[in-house]
Amino acid sequence: MIAPDLTMDIPTELGRVHFVGIGGSGMSGIARLFLAAGHRVTGSDSRDSDAVQALRELGAEIHVGHDAAHVGDADALVVTGALWQDNPEYVLAKERGLPILHRSQALAWLISGQRLVAVAGAHGKTTSTGMIVTALLEAGRDPSFVNGGVIGGIGVSSAPGSEELFVVEADESDGSFLLYDTAVALITNVDADHLDHYGSHEAFDDAFVRFASAASELVVISSDDPGARRVTARIEGRVVTFGEDPAADIRITDIVTDGPVAFTLTHDGVSRRAALRVPGRHNAINAAGAYAVLVGLGVDPDDAIAGLAGFSGTSRRFELHAEVRGVSVYDDYAHHPTEVRAALEAARTVVGEGRIIAVHQPHLYSRTQMMAGDFARVYEELADHTIVLDVFGAREDPIPGVTGALVSERFADASHVDYLPDWQQAADRAAEIARDGDFIVTLSCGDVYRIIPQVIGALERPAGSAQPAASSRPRE
């Protein structure tokens, strides 16, 4: 994988900007903002998608497949850390000496000078960002924003606004969240992840200390998460804490998780009851952090509570895709044991008497090797049956001996898990197990959502009918 130079000087003028992997959730949102700012945007992606089509309709010229010819007369290349070094567009840009910008560099360049709210943390970033944006709009504000997923009720992951206020989901995975000139920082948690980049828990903490210390106006940070508490102890300036901790500045109590979550927020001695349209205890926590940011931006506390009630979720966060013969099929972005726990606990609050059938696609060889036992314990505790696919390697080369079997082999009761690297077999198995009232939930930040049409097809086939020939994951 490539490692963009995050310290490079960027030209003051950029005309045509070429995005490699433009269809990704983060990249497509940034490309949309470049188009809105009047730049000529071109790009390439390995496959067509709704995101690609939407950008074309806005004026972007996008190719399916990668070829050096696509670079053309571009003034700069925008990439992610998941790009392979032999990508022909990257190779040509490097030969020409073109600026090659990480997506966060490109965004930081574009929004320079605006009042920036940056949301970071190992879990909950996309949801928290979506909550802040939704509530600001509900309160009559008009920020620009870019999020890691499409925000329900808004229908896009990014949009320009009329205010000099920008809300961004900041990516800590490769340290690029340190590029932003942040005014208000929200840290949802500091649960160690991405150690393939940072190398140690200490280095991971250090990055968040730098991120928080750079915020010029306000730091909002969890008081429940041990990692966040370590960071809080090392920073100065205006800090507002949130959580169930009795010492939190904004305290959460009386959480009710039977269906959409409801809870009480106590701030400056005043308690307010809040209710969301999304399930899960973790979303009460996310909402408390978002509330703190909103009040810090001058939103009336009652308006903040009302605005949060309008949030209906984001794409790939416990997102319902279909209901077939009484079986609900959901997808979730969870790819860390903590996130899987939150997603499955949320599912448990709404499934009623039904069962949860989890389809887990391990993400990254290094994470699978390090956390296989943690994943197995969470799935065995909270899912009624788990189907494990093979590893989605993303930016990593394979590690010998590391497959999805590492997770399935850690189950104490092997009857509760299947390791099925063949996607059609996995879809058929999920449909075979499922009955009226059950949930099938796919979980990963890889491409596991692409198995959903196969799951739906398997559910729609009459019992005992012939099944299609088994196949691996859908081809690009």
From Swiss-Prot:
UniProt-annotated location(s): Cytoplasm
GO biological process: cell division; cell wall organization; peptidoglycan biosynthetic process; regulation of cell shape
Major enzyme class: ligase
The keyword ATP-binding appears for this protein: yes
One GO molecular-function entry: ATP binding
Annotated residues for binding of ATP: 121-127
EC numbers: 6.3.2.8
Catalysed reaction equations from the record: UDP-N-acetyl-alpha-D-muramate + L-alanine + ATP = UDP-N-acetyl-alpha-D-muramoyl-L-alanine + ADP + phosphate + H(+)
Keyword vocabulary terms for this entry: ATP-binding, Cell cycle, Cell division, Cell shape, Cell wall biogenesis/degradation, Cytoplasm, Ligase, Nucleotide-binding, Peptidoglycan synthesis
Signal peptide stretch: none
Primary localization: cytoplasm
Role of this protein: Cell wall formation.
Protein name: UDP-N-acetylmuramate--L-alanine ligase
Encoding gene, per UniProt annotation: murC
